[in-house]
């Protein structure tokens, strides 16, 4: 990171966001979504006996979405945002040339979404959707060509609510296959380390 990336007057510096946590009702069911739909890779999982012994606070799995971004999916029965809230949400930066492909990909996986749309004057394009636990997500493209032709927000949040259980029955086997392959790679790496 270049020194110009930091506030020169700050006595200490933060290099990057290491990870973020998201509350979910079932860590492996949530991981299905983050691996199958968002292309994440399983990074770690907590052992239930560590929670029982008080060595870990809750059951969780970690999914790495890209270099430098890990999402820890913590099991808890509260904390998911209401469907009609905009915040908090997690914005994921995607390549401009892939935004339309993301729309097709979300449709394939039966994920309700809104967009692409823009926020007036930003030059960006966004798509909004929820994970199956109701956590709000955004796919974001800065400097999107043709942004001025896109509808401007705010969007109708009702359009991002999952009306059916996810994954849909016809996609469940594929989602499970992707998750199992990712879990096997993670466990192999842990054994070889």
Question: Where in the sequence are the language-model features?
Answer:
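Core segments of cupin and vicinal oxygen chelate
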Residues: 22-70
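A short beta-turn/loop motif at secondary-structure boundaries
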Residues: 51-55, 80, 118-122
């Amino acid at each position: 990171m270049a020194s110009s990336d930091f506030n020169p007057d700050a006595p200490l510096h933060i290099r990057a966001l290491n990870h973020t946590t998201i509350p979910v009702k079932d860590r492996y069911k949530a991981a299905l979504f983050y691996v199958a739909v968002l292309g994440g890779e399983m990074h770690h999982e907590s052992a239930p006996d560590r929670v029982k012994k008080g060595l870990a606070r809750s059951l969780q799995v970690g999914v790495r979405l890209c270099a430098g971004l890990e999402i820890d999916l913590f099991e808890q029965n509260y904390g998911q945002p209401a469907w009609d809230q905009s915040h908090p949400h997690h914005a994921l930066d995607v390549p401009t040339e892939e935004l339309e492909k993301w729309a097709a990909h979300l449709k394939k996986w039966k994920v309700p979404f809104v967009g692409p749309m823009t926020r007036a004057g930003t030059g960006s394009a966004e798509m909004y959707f929820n994970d199956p636990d109701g956590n709000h997500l955004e796919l974001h493209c800065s400097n999107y060509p043709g942004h001025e032709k896109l509808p401007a927000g705010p969007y109708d949040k009702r359009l991002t609510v999952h009306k059916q259980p996810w994954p849909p029955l016809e996609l469940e086997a594929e989602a499970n296959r992707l998750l199992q392959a990712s879990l096997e790679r993670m466990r192999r790496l842990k054994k070889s380390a």
